[in-house]
Amino acid sequence: MGASEEMKVLERVPVSKPPFEYNDLKKAVPPHCFTRSLSLSFYYLFYDLIKVCILFYVASKYIPMLPYSLSCIVWPLYWFFQGAFLGRLWMIGHECGHHSFSNYRWLDDTVGFLVHTATLTPYFSFKYSHRNHHAHTNSLEYDEVHVPKIRKFKSEHLYSEFLTNNPFGLVVNMVFELTFGYPSYLIFNYSGRKLTQAGFASHLYPQSPIFNDSERNHVFFSDVGICIVLYALYRIAIAKGAMLVLYVYGLPWVVMSAFIFSLTYLQHTHPSIPHYDSTEWNWLRGALSSIDRELAGAFNIKKTHYHVVHHLFPFIPEYHAHDATEALKPILGPYYKYDGTPFYKALWREMKDCLYVESDDGPNKTGVYWFKTKT
């Protein structure tokens, strides 16, 4: 990417009132994009399940038979690819939570529950909190995850700047976020919004202030599913050995978690997109404050390419997201943002430069906040 092209990528999106309304966008999307195909959805589900099962079988049966020197090469390759394929399955569970898998909500919840539980994600808990993310995207007060800090004084965030403004500190921070970011979010609400209600904020705690009373039974049901999977892994570890469970399931799960954290982080963290406080935020502004990237095309995770349309119309199935995006681009104009920076470069840049947000200085200072990198 040349210097001029990079400058264009980093150019801020407009924050003025767009010349279109939500209904204008909806009318521009081809009608077939809103159609859920049960056969297509199950095709992609079984296609991904077969890949995961084949890799599980090969890893548990054949890789342990390899010479040690060769297994040291094959195991990391397995962890990476299996983690990516588990991430693909996780995305199908995410689709189910948006009711874009089929026309039957009960079927979506059944498939989503089974898939997410198998990947140690509490389905209903995540579904409810993720719904809040879509309802309050890029709101500094009410968004659900990857909520940036507001810098009010120059003395704030000095530790973060020291940590990320040297290569060693940046690597340490990146490894921590990729390894622990997603499970810490589920367990401790790490990187989540600050809740005004008292109580332990966790996706695993039914009485958490994240949820309302009508959702708590489903949260408990999600916990039961997680406990069943953990118990099954425990029994397999007793029968086959803890090391085999770690290698076949545990480390691919860590890779999957890293994929999930990095994908969601990069879709909402970019120098060109704003965050808003309550004085300036509205739903359309928030939905437009995401970015399309080329992050996981090799693994057929198309939602990473078309995240803007996903926030505008989350019920559009991923296999129609391309057509919907192409139809919307002419209308969105400069309000649409795409960044083709390679995954590893984008992650390094954003974790280095997007430390905190603050409003622009000047007499027209508003509730629009941008990522800043300098003290």
Curated annotation (Swiss-Prot):
GO terms for cellular component: membrane. It is found in: Membrane. It is a multi-pass membrane protein. A motif (Histidine box-1) lies at residues 94-98. The keyword tRNA-binding does not apply. InterPro entries: FA_desaturase_dom (IPR005804), Fatty_acid_desaturase (IPR012171). The keyword Translocase does not apply. PANTHER family: OMEGA-6 FATTY ACID DESATURASE, CHLOROPLASTIC (PTHR32100). This is Delta(9) fatty acid conjugase-like enzyme.
